[in-house]
Regions:
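An edge-strand/N-cap motif at the start of beta-rich repeat modules
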Residues: 169-174, 179-218, 223-227, 247, ...
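Acidic carboxylate motifs that coordinate Ca2+ or other divalent cations, activating on Asp/Glu
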Residues: 220, 224, 269, 273, ...
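Short glycine/acidic-enriched loop and turn motifs that connect beta-strands
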Residues: 231-233, 280-282, 330-332, 378-380, ...
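Blade-edge motifs of beta-propeller repeat domains
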Residues: 16, 47, 183-207, 239-256, ...
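Hydrophobic beta-strand segments that make up the repeating blades of beta-propeller
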Residues: 225-229, 274-277, 324-328, 372-376, ...
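Blade-level signature of beta-propeller repeat domains, shared across WD40, Kelch, NHL, RCC1
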Residues: 509-542
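Beta-propeller blade termini
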Residues: 210-219, 259-268, 309-316, 357-364, ...
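Non-catalytic beta-sheet/beta-sandwich ligand-binding modules that flank or precede catalytic cores
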Residues: 1-195, 541-679
Length: 679
């Protein structure tokens, strides 16, 4: 604020001198802090799993702050120490309380900026500490022909400590002891991953479950389920006791047609809240968790223009709070609700004139902002992506004209860009669209066998062989006879083979594919809308099939031992399997061919081994335990007599034995004289 010289006069007419300038800055913007972590040298990503005993935390504020202290930091599953810093940068050490899920968060109103604006909450940092190395578990088995051994590990494993790479033959080593068999090589001759199977169990029977979401709602280190029971007008959650036994609890009731839920810490206070789109009431709600799983209903929008169809939560505008994307039916619009950091929301349009399924929000073009991929329905269904210009203004781009179903976005062919996996309901196809790196897409077929109305798609490494597989649920409206959940095994070159998870469900409209039982492989949980049931499918690992070669034939008393080689097999946290294991031995099958020699006299009476008779000749029978084509009279050694009239094939041969004089005789076949068909 300034007054220039000569702008006014006093009563005598003298002009004023320049005023002393008054300078002032208005700042009504609340500060916030971003939480990041390293293991001391390498960055640790939010929502990751590592084996670090501690994390080095950095708290970076968007401006200088005051009053920020160690007591402002909220945690579960661990504690902070060694806090220091000033201005806009602070550090601390986080130590987990055990091998478990952990979280670090900063609630609102705990510190201020220089003008004394109270802080906003921070996006929590979630991390799992895992120091348990993978082990070989029970179930090691041998093929009948001694050519392969199958070993199962306690968790999903990789060839590198960065959580990537399929296992190789050099990651295992063999040894053998006892018997006559010997190994041609201590290294497996081949390695392949056997397909998993799925064991299903019914979790609950809510009335009209529209979907199921999975989260550790009570922060007790296991996965719980959130279910909107549409026909019962209630939102339920199912508490896991840690052994996949579930107890039903209530989130909220008295709502007309809950269609979708999304669990997230919306108010950034360290516990899990739930956002929900309500179909009949046309409401957008969130349920605030008090930290003890008692929920208070909060209204975001009580007058949606259409029926609430889906919702998801993400920091769409990158301002360190959580916004909400909502799709509605009958008015055909897609909107996002901008959070001001205090859970007060402003509605913004993404697009109108179309209905849509739940969008995938991802930086598809990798330009630093969040785009959307979705199915739109406006007289002709289309697969589109909506490009964000960086200011949350979206431009529609067509991917394909195929009809609707579930979709996922992932780098399926692992070439460094995002592809789209989707279903074409009219043609009964499951497709994937390869991105050329510039968001131009080429359609490829995964399944064209008639999967009608594919309501949900899942993607991930289901069989643990290092590539991305696909799962799909068919919800046909024709009853349980036509409905199913299947998965498609990727051979590593995006050629897929279908396997069945479940048939006989009644409209499995939605499922999730994630680790539910804590063994780091991908299980499933499904919601059957018409069948009124929630089912859990445990992924039962098929194991690794290791080929081996023997240089000498075993007699059945050999012990074959298989162990990981040193620093070769890792879990996702980076723990290496030990070179010394249990449950890692098998006894080889006897592959030596036995030969039984029997005799009868001229009256066809048996002559026993070691007996004395006055028979002038014996008819001798040679019976092999396996068919042979190269057993000949020359393979038989005799003393005290001679063989004649030798004949036979397969496993049975005969000859006539004539002694040369009174006295002892022998008839024998030495080891290694002949072979079976396999050599």
């Amino acid at each position: 604020i300034d007054v220039a010289a000569g702008t006014f006069t006093d009563a005598s007419g003298y002009s004023n001198a320049a005023a002393t300038q008054f300078n002032w800055t208005y700042d009504g913007t609340s500060p916030y802090v971003a939480i990041t972590a390293t293991d001391g040298s390498n960055a640790v990503a939010n929502n990751s799993i590592t084996n670090d005993e501690t994390l080095s935390l950095t708290f970076t504020a968007n401006e200088s702050v005051t009053g920020f202290a160690i007591g402002d930091i909220g945690t579960f599953g661990g504690s902070v120490s060694s806090f220091s810093g000033s201005g806009s940068s602070y550090t601390a050490t986080f130590t987990p309380s055990g091998e478990r899920n952990t979280g670090i968060y900063l609630p609102t109103n705990t510190y201020t900026d220089i003008p004394t604006n109270n802080n906003l909450g921070s996006i929590p940092f979630y991390w799992r500490y895992d120091a348990t190395a993978p082990t070989i578990v029970s179930g090691t088995s041998l093929s009948s022909d001694n050519s392969t051994v199958t070993v199962k590990l306690s968790e999903l494993v990789y060839d590198t400590n960065s959580g990537s790479g399929a296992l190789e033959v050099g990651d295992f080593a063999f040894s053998i002891s006892g018997g006559l068999g010997t190994l041609a090589s201590a290294t497996p001759t081949s390695i392949s991953k056997a397909n998993p199977s799925f064991t299903d169990s019914q979790v609950a029977t809510p009335d009209g479950p529209q979907s199921v979401r999975t989260v550790d709602l009570d922060l007790d280190n296991d996965m719980d389920f959130i279910v909107p029971a549409f026909d019962d007008d209630i939102i339920l959650w199912y508490e896991n006791n840690g052994s996949q036994s579930f107890t039903q609890r209530t989130v909220g009731s008295g709502i007309d047609g809950p269609k979708e839920t999304y669990p997230v810490d919306l108010d950034l206070d360290g516990d899990m809240d739930i956002v929900s789109a309500i179909y009949n009431d046309k409401d957008l709600l969130w349920y605030e968790n008090d930290g003890s799983q008692s929920f208070t209903k909060r209204t975001i929008d009580a007058s949606l223009a259409g029926n609430g169809n889906h919702c998801m939560v993400v920091d769409l505008d990158g301002d360190n709070d959580l916004d909400i994307v909502v799709g509605t039916l009958n008015d055909n619009s897609l909107s996002w609700y901008e959070n001001d950091g205090s859970q007060s929301f402003t509605k913004n349009s993404i697009g109108t004139g179309f209905a849509s399924n739940l969008p995938v929000v991802i930086d598809l073009d990798e330009d630093g902002d969040l785009d959307m991929v979705m199915r739109t329905f406006e007289g002709g269904e289309k697969l589109r992506w909506f490009e964000n210009n960086g200011s949350e203004s979206f431009t529609q781009n067509l991917i394909d004209n195929s009809n609707g179903g579930g979709l996922k976005v992932i780098d399926l062919d692992e070439d460094g860009d995002y592809d789209v996996v989707s279903a074409d309901g009219n043609n009964g196809h499951v497709n994937w669209f390869a991105n050329n790196g510039s968001e131009s897409f080429t359609k490829n077929t995964i399944d064209n066998s008639g999967m009608s109305n594919v309501a949900c798609i899942g993607v991930g490494d289901i069989d643990g062989d290092g590539d991305i597989d696909v799962a799909a649920a068919q919800a046909s409206f024709n009853g349980a006879a036509d409905d199913k959940i299947v998965w498609y095994a990727n051979n590593g070159s995006e050629s897929f083979t279908e396997y069945t998870v479940e048939t006989g469900l009644n409209y499995p409209g939605q499922f999730e594919l994630l680790d539910i039982d804590g063994d780091k492989d991908l299980d499933m949980v499904s919601a059957a809308r018409q069948g009124d049931e929630i089912k859990f499918y445990e992924n039962v690992d098929g194991g690794y099939v290791l080929g081996f070669s023997l240089s000498a034939t075993p007699n059945g008393s050999e012990t074959l031992t298989v162990n990981p080689t040193s620093s070769a097999i890792f879990d996702v946290a980076g723990n290496a399997a030990s070179t010394s294991q249990s449950n890692n031995t098998v006894t080889l099958n006897n592959q030596r061919i036995s030969m039984a020699i029997t005799a009868v006299n001229g009256s066809s009476s048996a002559v026993s081994d070691g007996s004395t008779t006055n028979d002038a000749t014996l008819t001798v029978t040679f019976t092999s335990s396996a068919a042979t084509t190269n057993f000949a009279v020359g393979d038989v050694t005799v003393s005290g007599g001679a063989l004649s009239s030798f004949s036979g094939s397969g496993t049975n041969y005969t000859a006539t034995f004539t002694p040369t004089a009174d006295g002892a005789t022998t008839i024998d076949v030495a080891a290694g004289a002949f072979t079976d068909a396999s050599g």
